Regions:
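Extended active-site neighborhood of metal-dependent phosphoesterases/phosphodiesterases
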Residues: 1, 48-145, 149, 176-188, ...
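Solvent-exposed loop/turn segments at secondary-structure junctions
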Residues: 12-15, 40-43, 74-78, 105-107, ...
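The substrate-binding groove and active-site-proximal loops of carbohydrate-active enzymes
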Residues: 8-14, 39-49, 75-76, 122-133, ...
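Flexible, glycine-rich surface segments
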Residues: 159-175, 184-186
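Active-site metal-binding motif and surrounding structural segment of the metallo-beta-lactamase
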Residues: 26-44
């Protein structure tokens, strides 16, 4: 299957009317799969709240018969049930980052972690997203040199916090992953987080 349609939602922040309005624009368009690109089930306080919003998202897009992929945003990492939220998802490769093929297209998904340093006082020394990002250096290196990536006719990079064009003072992802991504022949990088539309042409921000 070379031609397909995917729906990508992000930064819903548990605001059901936003999802309803967005889905209303595409409800009559046949689609093959759905991606929730972070900050959709944010700041989960408990299992009941998390399950309610997960069920609503899946029900709205028909995830009983259409695959739905969930990427973690920085807000899914916060609040009392954030550690339990992980158990509600069947991640590709059982990690919060990974890759998969859809037809002749290769999708690579990265977990950018938090948008603040691990040393930020509100984390009380419990976070190690620096380690998570370093783990993904090894993942990326293997993925980009792998057969499935090289043989794909199109390649899509998905991540929540923009690797290019974010503008935050704290940008660890470009520092760690930039040299690998600079040589990677992705056709498009789709990110989220900023709550505003932006298009950055190839090469305009060091993006390949």
């Amino acid at each position: 299957q070379k031609d397909f349609t995917a729906l990508i939602f992000n930064d819903l922040h548990k605001h059901i009317p936003t999802l309803d309005a967005l889905y209303g624009q595409v409800r009559d368009i046949p689609y093959d799969f759905v991606v929730f690109n972070g900050d959709c089930i944010d700041d989960p306080a408990n299992e009941k709240e998390a399950l309610y919003h997960l069920a609503y998202l899946c029900g709205k897009v028909g995830a009983s018969h259409v695959p739905a992929f969930f990427l973690r945003g920085n807000h899914e990492i916060r609040n009392a049930y954030s550690i339990g939220l992980r158990a509600l998802f069947d991640y590709v490769g059982d990690k919060t980052y990974g890759a998969f093929n859809w037809g002749d297209t290769r999708f690579v998904m990265l977990d950018c972690g938090e948008d603040k340093p691990d040393s930020t006082w509100v984390y009380y020394g419990l976070n190690d997203f620096t380690g998570l990002r370093k783990d993904q250096v090894n993942f990326l290196s293997k993925e980009l040199s792998g057969k499935e990536f090289k043989q794909a006719s199109k390649r899509v990079l998905l991540n929540h916090i923009p690797i290019y064009g974010n503008g935050d003072a704290y940008e660890p992802c470009p520092e760690l992953w930039g040299s690998l991504l600079a040589k990677a022949p992705f056709n498009v990088n789709i990110s989220a987080h900023t709550h505003q539309y932006a298009f950055h042409p190839k090469g305009s921000l060091g993006n390949n």
